[in-house]
Amino acid sequence: MKQLNILLSFLLIGLCTTAQPLVNEADVLRGSLNENRDWFDIKRYVIDVTPNYEAKSIVGVVSWKALAVKPSKQIQIDLQTPMVIDSILLWPNVNDGMNAVRLEFTRSNNIAIAQIEKQIPKGKQFGLTIFYHGVPKEAIRPPWDGGWIWKKDSNGQPWMSVACQGLGASVWYPCKDHQSDEPEEGAQLTIQVPKDKNLIAIGNGRKVAETNMVNINNNNRFSWQVTNPINSYNIIPYIGDYVGWKETYKGLKGKLDISYWVLRSDSAKAVEQFKQVPKMLEAFEYWFGPYPFYEDGFQMVQSPHLGMEHQSAIAYGNQFKNGYFGRDL
């Protein structure tokens, strides 16, 4: 009987092993630094995105600033299906804003390969602009299951965000979706939302602009920027009926600007709960050293999921309770 149990155990292990899916081409293309990815170093992302809550779709344009570390005539752009790339422009001289070249490209699974007619030499900085649109994958159980999040708050107002550490940032914007390459010069995220819905859009870092586009598309534009290197999955929009307030923390590197953003309906309990934040920062700095992003400030943003460590704009969804939803782990 004992020998039979051992045999059955080995058979079960074998069945489980053979049932595992093999690595496919899409995994290799996204996970490896192949010849179409390893020749350039991302320096900066500039992202402009407009979500449509009713259609659960987005329209956007993303610009890359990059440095060629060796010459090449092909470049890989990551954008997961069913998102669609409309066009790609190459700026051979990234700073002159002129002489853009439209690139031909082919799609394969979750990537695009664009052909560069005139080889970019080693040491040359160049720019890429990608126009795109589509219905991004919707997160079913964020943050563990990634994608775009479309919810409503208790007052029926749209509440949107993204969680994409596992899936990668290419689930919603075209990028070099590899965690080895962070843009050293940071990133800018502009989010457009309908003016008539009174929504606020928040991104990483500091707000650098807020403009009304009533004469063009009746949208409000909120632009945010980080100056520190940032992982692509950490660049995240938060959109909702937010209210905010600020305070200053005197930390190990001087003055740290703290901003809080919460849903209007939760503002009273949020003010009370977030009184702990300066003490938390003090404890972390005592044990782990200075907060690394003083230049970009520190934000706590109420999110439509439990939470994520999104750099300089922490996603918070713990219902304003201590512990894990009010209980110890």
Give residue spans per PLM region.
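Juxtacatalytic substrate-recognition/specificity segment
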Residues: 191, 223, 241-329
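Zn2+-dependent metallopeptidase catalytic core
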Residues: 62, 119, 125, 129-131, ...
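Extended, low-hydrophobicity, Ser/Thr/Pro/Gly-biased non-transmembrane segments
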Residues: 24-26, 36, 128-242
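Bacterial Sec-dependent N-terminal signal peptides
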Residues: 1-25
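N-terminal, polar/Ser/Thr-rich
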Residues: 19-61, 86, 153-157
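Ligand-binding face of N-terminal immunoglobulin V-set domains in extracellular IgSF glycoproteins
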Residues: 55-82
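Beta-strand-rich interaction surfaces with strong enrichment in secreted/lumenal proteins
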Residues: 47-50, 64, 101-104, 115-120, ...
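A surface-exposed beta-strand-loop module
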Residues: 80-151
